[in-house]
Amino acid sequence: MIPKELQSRLAGHGITTCDEIALREALEARVETYTLIRLASWPARRWKCRYRLLIGDTMHDAQSAAEAYALGLLAVLG
């Protein structure tokens, strides 16, 4: 589950289904390549995130894969 703020921002772009698979598919439709990294426990504690999404030269830190995909989508959509 992603935060309500991200859900409302995505809805503004016409994305209303906010589960991990739907968000991943929406991101894949808009970007050619990306990398999702699940961080080990010590970097997760240090950076206070569990996932890191890399798109080009940008980086998005998140607590869940779905949140990472949502942040990436919002960055791509502007």
Question: Language model features by range: what are they?
Answer:
Residues M1-Q63, E67, L74, G78:
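N-terminal segment of the canonical double-stranded RNA-binding domain
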